[in-house]
Amino acid sequence: MASGQFVNKLQEEVICPICLDILQKPVTIDCGHNFCLKCITQIGETSCGFFKCPLCKTSVRKNAIRFNSLLRNLVEKIQALQASEVQSKRKEATCPRHQEMFHYFCEDDGKFLCFVCRESKDHKSHNVSLIEEAAQNYQGQIQEQIQVLQQKEKETVQVKAQGVHRVDVFTDQVEHEKQRILTEFELLHQVLEEEKNFLLSRIYWLGHEGTEAGKHYVASTEPQLNDLKKLVDSLKTKQNMPPRQLLEDIKVVLCRSEEFQFLNPTPVPLELEKKLSEAKSRHDSITGSLKKFKDQLQADRKKDENRFFKSMNKNDMKSWGLLQKNNHKMNKTSEPGSSSAGGRTTSGPPNHHSSAPSHSLFRASSAGKVTFPVCLLASYDEISGQGASSQDTKTFDVALSEELHAALSEWLTAIRAWFCEVPSS
């Protein structure tokens, strides 16, 4: 097949552009084009000394026609190749055993047969038909198979489209559930963060107000102690005086000493005591609720994990482990409080507790949510690190429920860690 195509390509190069047949006695004229000697001679018969090339229309000399031996040899080689090709094809269509042309096809053996083979005992009882008839029969079978396969192709395309649709529906559901989980846990994280900020801000406010009350208490009692000390000093001085001087104004001094009374103000206002008691009660309630919720969530998660991993094979577990590892690395830098590009960490709102109104902390909105001024949105870490005195911090540490603080912090940490395990979009 390949050699036949090669011969045909070569034959195209030795075609006379006048007679459109293989060059016979090829000659070349001045412009370089090749023609049959007979064809180009007929063109030049009507002219005197010059004639125009049939291809490029260039004027060439009539007596400049010259034989092209190389082209003649090429034509001979091509003709020899063509003869060999024809002989090869003829040989292929000839029975190698009897040297006769093939005319029949044996259905039983799938072989071509000549007249002699057809009558031989090897094929006489077989289903034998003419080559053209057998080919026509198989053409029909081929056409039937084409139609069957085309119908299967059509059905396969439909099945594939349905499968792709199911995959799309599945991935859409997965994405929806992922966004649902992220949204719900983000809301939970926000609620816990707001609750934590409020509780810490309230307890710090109580500590701050208690410290201010202590300062007021000291400011009220210190002058009285100074007055008492002066009275004692004056009596001691009188006691060491001579009799005459001792008796001078003695009644006034004694009367003043007897009339002295220590005015003891309330160290901590009852309103602050009440608010602290309410805060502690709220802290106990939250701690208990969080513990119950945490225990239930952990128990349910354990059951869910067991169901999820039970049907996984080794490859599934491997892909799961890689996914967890990659997601953890990807999301670690996006956790709240992680380092930014400049090496600084994200902090909460600044602490401006000195300008906080005394009772605006406990206003309630129409939606039932507790509202509080931005100046009180300070975390414990911010309070202890932004200019609070040692007395302020000590009072705050005593008032704050360590159990509540630990519970809230544990939940916020757990939620952030959970975010790192959820694949991102």
Curated annotation (Swiss-Prot):
Key words, A-Z: Antiviral defense, Coiled coil, Cytoplasm, Immunity, Inflammatory response, Innate immunity, Metal-binding, Mitochondrion, Transferase, Ubl conjugation, Ubl conjugation pathway, Zinc, Zinc-finger
Chain coiled-coil ranges: 126-162, 270-307
Annotated region (Disordered), positions in chain: 328-360
Tissue/organ expression: Up-regulated in gastric adenocarcinomas.
Pfam families (UniProt xref): zf-B_box, zf-C3HC4_4
E.C. code: 2.3.2.27
GO biological process, one term: positive regulation of DNA-binding transcription factor activity
Catalytic activity: S-ubiquitinyl-[E2 ubiquitin-conjugating enzyme]-L-cysteine + [acceptor protein]-L-lysine = [E2 ubiquitin-conjugating enzyme]-L-cysteine + N(6)-ubiquitinyl-[acceptor protein]-L-lysine
InterPro entries registered for this protein in UniProt: TRIM/RBCC (IPR050143), Znf_B-box (IPR000315), Znf_B-box_chordata (IPR020457), Znf_RING (IPR001841), Znf_RING/FYVE/PHD (IPR013083), Znf_RING_CS (IPR017907)
GO molecular function, one term: transcription coactivator activity
Compositional bias ranges of the Low complexity kind: 336-360
Gene3D superfamilies linked to this entry: Classic Zinc Finger, Zinc/RING finger domain, C3HC4 (zinc finger)
Location within or outside the cell: Cytoplasm; Mitochondrion
Keyword set includes Cell inner membrane: no
Gene Ontology cellular component terms for the protein in this record: cytoplasm; cytosol; mitochondrion
UniProt zinc finger (RING-type) residues: 16-57
Impact after mutating residue 16 to A: Abolished E3 ubiquitin-protein ligase activity and ability to ubiquitinate NLRP3
Zinc finger (B box-type): 90-131
Pathway: Protein modification; protein ubiquitination
PTM section of the record: Auto-ubiquitinated (in vitro).
Family listed: Belongs to the TRIM/RBCC family.
Subunit structure: May form oligomers. Interacts with isoform p52shc of SHC1.
Protein name: E3 ubiquitin-protein ligase TRIM31
Organism of this sequence: Homo sapiens
Gene assigned in the entry: TRIM31
